[in-house]
């Protein structure tokens, strides 16, 4: 179901625990979306990346070729207070920050810039 690299190994997800992008075989995209929606009901939204790209979730400009080539085709977007991990090691890959870049909560969608003289 997951696309493979040239060595036959599954492609690892892109993004973070707050915006998780999978590389799914096109012919199995709907199947994967349905399976994940059922499994993650109440925890995360599962959305084809095309909907996010077409909806301007990555900005007003057209997404770059590099982004489209690397991002994957199925997004898992955890709800407030949730996260998704494909690999976890205690004390190494723990998420301690709320509002990590990438989520869809208002706090994560807003960027705050502070300029100060150094």
Q: Which ranges hold each PLM region?
A:
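Feature captures the catalytic ectodomains and active-site-proximal regions of enzymes
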Residues: 1-118
């Amino acid at each position: 179901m997951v696309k493979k690299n040239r060595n036959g190994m599954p492609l690892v997800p892109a993004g973070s625990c707050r915006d998780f992008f999978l590389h799914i075989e096109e012919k199995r995209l709907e199947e994967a979306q349905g399976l994940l929606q059922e499994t993650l009901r109440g925890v995360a939204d599962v959305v084809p990346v095309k909907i996010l790209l077409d909806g301007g979730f990555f900005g007003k400009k057209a997404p770059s070729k590099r982004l489209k080539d690397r991002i994957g085709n199925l997004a898992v977007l955890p709800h407030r207070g949730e996260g998704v991990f494909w690999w976890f090691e205690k004390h190494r890959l723990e998420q301690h920050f709320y509002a990590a870049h990438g989520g869809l909560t208002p706090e994560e969608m807003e960027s705050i810039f502070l300029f100060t003289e150094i």
